């Protein structure tokens, strides 16, 4: 059995830039008729969540927190 291998999270900036670009281009549907959350997620909430990920989420900060813990990969 192979030993666990130390691992650090390091998402390339190009990937994060691509994600922000795709979030900027998101096309939202109309809100489904009926009560919000009755037939899926509330449109306003999803739009707010998208804006947060696009404009405010600090991936590097959270990446550093996660890398503060010992991370490993292991074959299963």
Regions found by a protein language model. Give the residues of each.
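Basic/polar N-terminal segments that are highly enriched at the extreme N-terminus
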Residues: 1-6, 10
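Non-catalytic accessory segments flanking enzyme active sites
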Residues: 15-76
């Amino acid at each position: 059995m192979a030993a666990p291998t130390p691992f650090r999270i390091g998402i390339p900036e190009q990937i994060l830039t691509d994600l922000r670009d795709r979030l900027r281009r998101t096309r939202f549907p109309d809100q489904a008729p009926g009560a919000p959350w009755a037939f899926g997620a509330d449109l306003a909430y999803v739009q707010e969540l998208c804006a947060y990920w696009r404009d405010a989420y600090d991936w590097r900060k959270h990446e550093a927190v996660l890398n503060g813990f010992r991370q490993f990969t292991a074959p299963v």
